[in-house]
Design a protein with these regions (language model features):
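FAD-binding core of flavoproteins
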Residues: 1-89, 93, 206, 211-215
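Alpha-helical interface subdomain recognition
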Residues: 64-215
């Protein structure tokens, strides 16, 4: 109680078979997650991770790595972009291509530009990690830009393919085996995983721009 905030936290590994531990599944529009409960659970001291009272450093390090991973999600939509691009170039029964429309070319070009920008950011991050560096502001910036870019790219791809892109997998009418529809739903969770994008903008201001913390 006498330590400053965040300084008295320790991380322990818990065997989920221990008495008192339970969990419930929480379905979401993306992958399911879970809530965990600890009712008088006792954990042996030798299950300590790292140093005693050194847990907050582990938590923040994990969060930064999680943000980098979430920001890199835009790489996951590269495959969908390429498939939509090929679909747009293919001719229908009337000999027409979706890519003939100027607005489709414009949308595809913006998607490509965002993906290339994110790819360069990911290369920068990979180089930093190889050198043992972790920039808090860059991790948060990557998460914000990457997650919001993924949502925007998927939205544009959905506009290009039309109503068929909104049909779930398993239906004969599903375009691209329903992958685009699923990723559109799943991408929403990127904005709050690892800390909401609003929180990330505060971290960018604090650690990247040297601005004071919000009251």
């Amino acid at each position: 109680p006498d330590l400053p905030r965040h300084k008295g936290i320790s991380i322990l590994i818990l065997d989920t078979r221990e008495a008192g531990f339970s969990h419930t599944v929480i379905p979401t529009c993306s992958n399911p997650t879970a809530a965990t409960y600890y009712d008088n659970v006792k954990v042996p001291a030798d299950m300590l991770v790292g140093k005693l009272n050194g847990g907050w450093q582990l938590v923040t390090s994990q969060l930064n790595h999680e943000r980098l991973g979430l920001g890199a999600w835009s790489d996951k939509v590269v495959g969908l972009f390429r498939r939509v691009f090929l679909w747009a170039r293919a001719r229908d029964e009337n000999g027409r291509c979706a890519i003939d429309a100027p607005w489709v070319r414009s949308q595809l070009a913006e998607c490509y530009a965002r993906l290339e920008a994110m790819r360069l950011i990911n290369f920068r991050i990979a180089a930093d990690l190889e050198q043992g560096r972790m920039d808090v502001a860059l991790a948060s910036s990557t998460k914000v830009y990457g997650s919001e870019s993924a949502i925007e790219i998927l939205r544009k791809l959905s506009e290009i393919v039309g109503a068929s892109g909104l049909v779930r997998a398993g239906s004969a009418a599903a375009l691209l085996l329903g992958e685009l529809e699923y990723e559109v739903r799943a991408s929403v969770t990127l904005t709050f995983g690892g800390g909401t994008n609003e929180i990330q903008r505060g971290l960018i201001a604090q650690f990247g721009l040297g601005m004071p913390r919000a009251a």
